[in-house]
Amino acid sequence: MKVRASVKKMCRNCKIVRRHGHVRVICSVDPKHKQRQG
């Protein structure tokens, strides 16, 4: 999980999701693409 000021999709399988006031990126193909805005 990377914590970044600006989250972007890293591949076409990444999805941007808003959970508990945080913007997250989840990826079913590559778990390294997980990010959270912080």
Curated annotation (Swiss-Prot):
Keywords (A to Z) from UniProt: Ribonucleoprotein, Ribosomal protein
GO terms of biological process kind: translation
Signal sequence extent: none
Protein name according to UniProt: Large ribosomal subunit protein bL36
Tagged with keyword Ribonucleoprotein: yes
Gene Ontology terms: cellular component: cytoplasm; ribonucleoprotein complex; ribosome
Domain of life: Bacteria
Family that this chain belongs to: Belongs to the bacterial ribosomal protein bL36 family.
PROSITE patterns attached to this UniProt entry: RIBOSOMAL_L36
GO molecular function: structural constituent of ribosome
Matching HAMAP family: Ribosomal_bL36
A Pfam match: Ribosomal_L36
